[in-house]
Amino acid sequence: PWLTYGVSEERKEFVANLLPAVYPEWKKRYQGRISEDIFEMGDALIANYDKYSEVREGPMTLDQGDLRLDNILFVDQNNRAILLDWQTAAVGLPLNDVAYCISTSFDNPNDRADSEESLVKEYHSSLNIEESYSFEDAWNDYRRGSFVGFLMAVMSAMIVERTERGDEMFAVMAERSGWQALHLDAVSFLK
């Protein structure tokens, strides 16, 4: 099978080992650039990654894994969009990609906070699956998925070749996703 990197003990173990190894250096790199509130949220996430990575009951989907505007080609015909960069595809929560895309697409956290619930409602409604996947479940998956962009920013910043542009991009990703996770009280899922 082409999708071997899904919800598995191997993946959880890989990330659980990688995060504590790279996170302290990541914090040093971005000290003074990223808010202490986001660092504290990250500390809680890293310390409780085992709780975060527990598979919850409910539907799972194929996640693109890096769904941000840079990885979407918009096509005028039939109102379609083409998703690029599938190297991080995995099985995950149905709203992971939605949370990631929304968090990285708004430069103002207040604008994101004002818009996201209505965007998620519209997305959920378009799926026509209310009987099997309630909006409440989708919203909780969205809130939980708000950590995805932060985790991607931390891990990617520390494993790719370092550049000035990359440092800024990963800082912005971490900030936007971090503010989203804080606003949505995603830390409550770590208890």
Language-model segments: which ranges?
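Active-site activation/catalytic loop segments of kinase-like enzymes and analogous catalytic loops
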Residues: V91-E130, S146-E168
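ATP-dependent phospho-/nucleotidyl transfer catalytic cores
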Residues: P1-Q64
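Regulatory N- and C-terminal appendages and interdomain linkers associated
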Residues: E40, S53-E54, N79, E136, ...
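A short glycine-rich, hydrophobically flanked beta-strand micro-motif that places a catalytic Asp/Glu
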Residues: I72, S132-W139
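Active-site acidic catalytic loop and adjacent metal/ATP-binding pocket
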Residues: I46-P94
